[in-house]
Amino acid sequence: MDFGLFTCGYQHLPLETAFYDAKAFGYDYIELWGGRPHAFASDLLTGDASKIRDLIQKYQMPVYIYTPEHNAYPYNYMIGTEHQWEESMNYLSSAFRAASDIGAQYTLVSIGHGGSATPNQRKQRLERSLYCLCAAAEEADQTILLETLTPYESNTCTRLEDLREILDKIDSPALLGMCDVVPPFVQKEDPVDYARVLGKRMGHLHLVDNDGQSDSHLLPGDGIMPLRKIIQELREAGYDGMATIELVTNYMSDPSFYAELALNRVKELL
């Protein structure tokens, strides 16, 4: 597996710190958090993309995945008025263009909370959104990595079977599924089944630990997940690709320390 550093935890530091750390600690790539001050889509499209490309070149550290901030304020394509939906589509379409500008191959899109809409209404809205987004992604030469969230975060498409169904329905070359190990774990599903069921349509992995009763993304080894077994069985199931160690805001107090510790712990599991 290739292991990626997620830059979200570095948002109070210069972005260059994340690139420096990724190189120094032995990460293989960066998954770039698309929020301010580092890499908001409109900022990248108005000149900041060159700064990212300079960091990639300076540290010889590729950005494979761009992960725009969405599903909360102010963008969630699964909820709100028609105008708000259109703004969300425009925002994510701009994120695809920004990702291409920095040389990323993939843009990560997750499925937010659908509010009080009925299950059928949420399904229709998700399908409509993904048809629109896939067209925009193809135009920008991007591939979408579609991520399920936990039931603590979303009420739409939280399980593997939901993801398989929507991938079958949309059937776009610009759309792949992925597995964040937390949503299946808290719903008593086996994360490895994502690789078994999706096969070549599983394009990415978020690897962290969890307490089994929340959406917490914990440092590997600090939760109760059988990570060694999961990694081994993912490989046996045919998945040996990108795996971002997705440390988020829990570790912003000292992101460098935790990024190094997380990678060392994961490598001990191999």
Language model features: what each stretch is:
Residues 1-6, 65-78, 108-114:
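N-terminal small/glycine-rich loop or linker at the start of catalytic domains
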Residues 58, 75-176, 186:
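Active-site acidic/histidine proton-transfer and metal-coordination neighborhood
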Residues 28-29, 62, 105, 143, ...:
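Residue-level detector of anion-binding/catalytic polar loops
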Residues 9-11, 34-36, 69-72, 111-115, ...:
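Active-site-proximal loop/turn and secondary-structure-junction residues that shape catalytic pockets
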Residues 56-64:
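Glycine-rich, aromatic-flanked loop segments that form ligand/cofactor-binding clefts
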Residues 31, 65, 108, 145, ...:
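Conserved beta-strand positions in the central sheet of alpha/beta enzyme cores
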Residues 1-4, 9-26, 53, 57, ...:
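Histidine-acidic metal/acid-base catalytic patches
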Residues 33-53, 111-113, 117:
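Glycine-rich, proline-tolerant flexible connector loops at the mouths of alpha/beta enzymes
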